[in-house]
UniProtKB/Swiss-Prot annotation:
Disulfide bonds: none annotated. The gene is VQ1. This is VQ motif-containing protein 1. It comes from Arabidopsis thaliana (Mouse-ear cress). GO terms for cellular component: nucleus. It comes from the Eukaryota.
Length: 98
């Protein structure tokens, strides 16, 4: 280095790529573990119109989802959970009454 020339220290960032497969219920927890940050979720009014994206009934979005198997479609335990679950609007009404 020549006299009088000052350089800034170099910042080095290491990126550790990880591939994670999770379900919707565990997504928030996984993100918090990977980022080391807690999410802040604001309370607010929750409304359920009974219709999903594009005006379609959202209860149909979870039916028929499964892994492709060699001999047809294999239904997962997660899919069964959503088929047996009451509508989200009904759950919200039950929880908000207490």
């Amino acid at each position: 280095m020549s006299a009088g020339v000052r350089s800034e220290p170099m910042k080095v960032v290491f990126i550790n790529t990880q591939y994670v497969q999770t379900d919707a219920r565990s997504f928030k927890t996984i993100v918090q573990e990977l980022t080391g940050k807690n999410a802040v979720v604001a309370d607010g009014p929750y409304e359920f119109s009974g219709q999903g994206y594009g005006g379609k009934d959202s209860s149909q979005r979870f039916c028929g989802v499964g892994k492709e198997a060699e001999r047809g479609v294999e239904t997962t335990e997660f899919d069964s959970f959503f088929r047996e679950m009451p509508p989200v609007g009904e759950l919200y009404n039950l929880w908000s009454d207490h």
